[in-house]
Structure formats: structure tokens, C-alpha cells
């Protein structure tokens, strides 16, 4: 399956996800973030896909940073519920709440069969990454992440 969407890979660094690789969709007019760019883990699908599989102490640290920063959209209870959903279905979704036009889907990459420090994912307009399309796209990304995980084991 070819998605023709932007593809990214990121690694966790403290409370951020750092983009380490990516390619932009030939069909997207949206601005992409560049390799080396950082986003808070709770603000993107790549970050949530990694955070969901971190030890409780790491999640607690992210929640404490909510209180310190008092940032918009930083609800610890909602985050915990979302992380539980990510663990159960295997992938994260992030909708751009500010613009409402972009959707991201990401899955964790498992290192040596046990730790999650990275994720891969796609992003594109919500007109193409619709609720009906997301499960099939997520399955494709999950299969790709499993191949990467096997190569890293």
C-alpha cells in the first residue's frame, strides 16, 4: 500500500520527540517540520506513540510538566486515557485541533523486543486521513514498524 502522505520517524528525548527522518508528500501543500525539529511528546502522534509505551515515571514527568507550563490542551487525565487507547489498538492519532486540517497516525518501533524509543508515522490532510481510512493506514504503518523492529532485534 502506498499512502502518498508525508512520512516521519522520531525518537524520544526527555519530554520531546525529535524528528530524525522524513519525506514530504508530493501531494501536500502543508508545511512539514524539518529533521531535528522538536515537539512536545503529547502534541503529536509520533510522541504519543512513544509515550504510551514508556514506564509510568516518564508519563508522570510529562504530566508534571503540564502543571509547570499550564499549556492549552494539557489535561493529564485525558492524556492517560488516550495513552491507554494507544496501547490497546497499537497506534496513535493526532488531529490538529487548531487548524482542524491535518491528521497524523503513528506507531511505536520496538527495540530488541522490549523498549520503545522511536516511532514512525504519516501525516496528511484530514480530508484524506478520514476516520474510515485511518484503520487501514494504521495497519500498513504497524506492519512497517514490525519489520523495522525485527531488523533492530
Go through the PLM ranges and name each one.
Residues 1-24, 136, 140-152:
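Intrinsically disordered, low-complexity terminal regulatory regions
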Residues 28-98:
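Short, solvent-exposed recognition segments
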Amino acid at each position: 500500500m502506498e499512502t502518498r502522505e508525508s512520512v516521519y520517524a522520531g525518537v524520544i528525548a526527555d519530554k520531546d520527540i525529535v524528528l530524525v527522518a522524513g519525506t514530504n508528500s508530493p501531494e501536500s501543500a502543508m508545511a512539514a517540520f524539518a529533521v531535528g525539529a522538536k515537539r512536545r511528546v503529547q502534541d503529536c502522534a509520533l510522541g504519543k506513540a512513544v509515550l504510551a509505551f514508556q514506564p509510568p515515571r516518564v508519563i508522570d514527568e510529562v504530566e508534571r510538566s503540564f502543571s509547570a507550563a499550564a499549556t492549552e490542551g494539557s489535561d493529564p487525565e485525558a492524556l492517560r486515557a488516550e495513552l491507554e487507547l494507544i496501547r490497546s489498538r497499537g497506534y496513535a492519532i493526532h488531529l490538529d485541533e487548531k487548524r482542524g486540517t491535518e491528521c497524523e497516525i503513528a506507531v511505536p518501533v520496538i527495540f530488541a523486543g522490549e523498549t520503545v524509543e522511536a516511532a514512525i508515522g504519516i501525516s496528511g490532510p484530514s480530508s484524506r486521513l478520514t476516520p474510515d481510512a485511518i484503520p487501514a493506514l494504521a495497519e500498513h504503518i504497524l506492519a512497517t514498524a514490525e519489520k523495522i523492529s525485527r531488523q533492530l532485534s
